[in-house]
Amino acid sequence: MRELPHVLGIVLAGGEGKRLYPLTADRAKPAVPFGGAYRLIDFVLSNLVNARYLRICVLTQYKSHSLDRHISQNWRLSGLAGEYITPVPAQQRLGPRWYTGSADAIYQSLNLIYDEDPDYIIIFGADHVYRMDPEQMMQFHIESGAGATVAGIRVPRSEASAFGCIDADESGRIREFIEKPADPPGTPDDPEQTFVSMGNYIFTTKVLIDAIRADADDDHSDHDMGGDIIPRLVADGMAAVYDFKNNEVPGATERDHGYWRDVGTLDAFYDAHMDLVSVHPVFNLYNKRWPIRGESENLAPAKFVNGGSAQESVVGAGSIISAASVRNSVLSSNVVVDDGAIVEGSVLMPGVRIGRGAVVRHAILDKNVVVGPGEMVGVDLDKDRERFAISAGGVVAVGKGVWI
């Protein structure tokens, strides 16, 4: 029987998420609710746990209370075999300063690595929507002999200029890591596609420690994993790209194989929700062989009364739709839509109340928003613009606890 390598998972969850405002006004970006029953961090944690990586440190910083609480309440492991998922707030172990970048977060947390003494370290971001089996990426990393492996997703070359792009040879070795190039490189097998970094990395431990320490001594560095650490290792010939297309998740459909979304803007966050609602969704939440674990509240089932209906929609537990119409929408837990109300193409987070005869279209309503009887959101954008955030794509975003 092959001895399993000793692996430590580190999840970078300190992001402020300014482009998701107002959803990040009171919480860290990884704590933003998603998909009716989850928070963004649940996707990366589910991927790691499903692959049996059960020693995980979640590095937090910005407005982390709800994130810390979510992890402690919903991600308890047994601990009997040294298993843990633990949030680690910025400790200021090296002086009175916060993290200045993702690489600095690792530098200030080197004690976690020394304590665990792993063979390999998985460093993943906390704010993407996807399924992935990290064990397959780990096997690629070990077999390639690289010191660092970057998960790369293929995008059309014509769209790649907005991302960090990877130029690799046929073996997967990275020749150059280029941030937002005007002329993106093609992949070795397709000149019309480009490898884009997913922000997920695997390192051989000594390679990471040496690179992190060298970066910390560099006064000209921004101390960023993608912007500084990976280019440093690329220059030394030590980095490889893992093709996400080759990742085979148990139970994945042909439609959602290779699905990955960066939901860092309101429009991207909205579009990712719309990927969930069709009969055959672009991203399937119902894969029992690779489950996404989320909130574990003990809630009653959703209820539809007085002819209330929901079509092409996701409706969370505890929600009640009474003589109302819901279409192409995602409703989280404990949402109430009252008589005669219409909700179309919208995302309603936990505890939202839609009053009698109200209309909500093309909108994101954060927790505990109340839309009064007869009120309208997303119908008159000029009026909405005076009081709410509106994305470039015309999505109206209403912050937590607002009464309309």
Swiss-Prot record:
Give its E.C. classification number: 2.7.7.27
- EC class, as a word, reads transferase
Answer whether the UniProt record assigns the keyword Signal to this protein: no
- How does inactivating the gene affect the organism? Inactivation of glgC shows a strong reduction in alpha-glucan content. Combined inactivation of both glgC and treS results in a complete absence of alpha-glucan.
Record-level GO BP terms? glycogen biosynthetic process
Q: Does the keyword Repeat apply?
A: no
Q: Which UniProt keywords apply?
A: ATP-binding, Carbohydrate metabolism, Glycogen biosynthesis, Glycogen metabolism, Nucleotide-binding, Nucleotidyltransferase, Transferase
Q: Which InterPro entries match?
A: ADP-Glc_PPase, ADP_Glu_pyroP_CS, GlgC_bac, GlmU/GlgC-like_hexapep, NTP_transferase_dom, Nucleotide-diphossugar_trans, Trimer_LpxA-like_sf
Q: Name one GO molecular function term.
A: ATP binding
User: What does it catalyze?
Assistant: alpha-D-glucose 1-phosphate + ATP + H(+) = ADP-alpha-D-glucose + diphosphate
Sites where the protein binds alpha-D-glucose 1-phosphate: 99, 164, 179-180, 197
Query: To which pathway does this protein belong?
Result: Glycan biosynthesis; glycogen biosynthesis
Q: Name one Pfam family in it.
A: NTP_transferase
According to its UniProt entry, what is the function of this protein?
Answer: Involved in the biosynthesis of ADP-glucose building block, required in the biosynthesis of maltose-1-phosphate (M1P) and in the elongation reactions to produce linear alpha-1,4-glucans. Catalyzes the reaction between ATP and alpha-D-glucose 1-phosphate (G1P) to produce pyrophosphate and ADP-Glc.
Q: What else is known?
A: Maltose-1-phosphate (M1P) is generated by two alternative routes: the TreS-Pep2 branch and the GlgC-GlgM branch, however it seems that the GlgC-GlgM branch provides most of M1P for the GlgE pathway in M.smegmatis.
Q: Which NCBIfam families match?
A: glgC (TIGR02091), PRK00725.1 (NF001947), PRK00844.1 (NF002023)
- Family indicated by similarity: Belongs to the bacterial/plant glucose-1-phosphate adenylyltransferase family.
Q: Which PANTHER family match?
A: GLUCOSE-1-PHOSPHATE ADENYLYLTRANSFERASE (PTHR43523:SF2), GLUCOSE-1-PHOSPHATE ADENYLYLTRANSFERASE-RELATED (PTHR43523)
Designated name of the protein: Glucose-1-phosphate adenylyltransferase
Which organism does this sequence originate in? Mycolicibacterium smegmatis (strain ATCC 700084 / mc(2)155) (Mycobacterium smegmatis)
